[in-house]
Amino acid sequence: MDGIKYAVFTDKSIRLLGKNQYTSNVESGSTRTEIKHWVELFFGVKVIAMNSHQLPRKGRRMGPIMAHTMHYRRMIITLQPGYSIPPLRKKRT
């Protein structure tokens, strides 16, 4: 499934990790139930709440036409106490 694009690490998302809430950007066409099912299946955790919001669009000018580049939304996933998602790290060479 390619609904989840990547995890987000901002000041707010790092603060929310203490409350067992994980933040990621997802495709705008994905539904909450799809993302919830995928997270529970892939990571083996229990999701109790999901919040999402659209980020402000960024404009990109192509000649006289103004286009927008943001085609995703941010999802905050709250897990049941006792569950956690291991950090996703890239292996450095």
UniProtKB/Swiss-Prot annotation:
Biological process, per Gene Ontology: translation
Subcellular location: Plastid, Chloroplast
Entry keyword annotation includes Metal-binding: no
GO terms assigned for molecular function: mRNA binding; rRNA binding; structural constituent of ribosome
Keyword Chloroplast among UniProt keywords: yes
Pfam families the record matches: Ribosomal_L23
UniProtKB keywords: Chloroplast, Plastid, Ribonucleoprotein, Ribosomal protein, RNA-binding, rRNA-binding
GO cellular component annotations of the record: chloroplast; ribonucleoprotein complex; ribosome
PROSITE patterns noted in UniProt: RIBOSOMAL_L23
HAMAP family found in the cross-reference section: Ribosomal_uL23_B
Subunit structure: Part of the 50S ribosomal subunit.
Family, similarity comment: Belongs to the universal ribosomal protein uL23 family.
The protein's role, per its UniProt record: Binds to 23S rRNA.
Name listed for the protein in its UniProt record: Large ribosomal subunit protein uL23cz/uL23cy
Species, as recorded: Citrus sinensis (Sweet orange)
Organism classification: Eukaryota, Viridiplantae, Streptophyta, Embryophyta, Tracheophyta
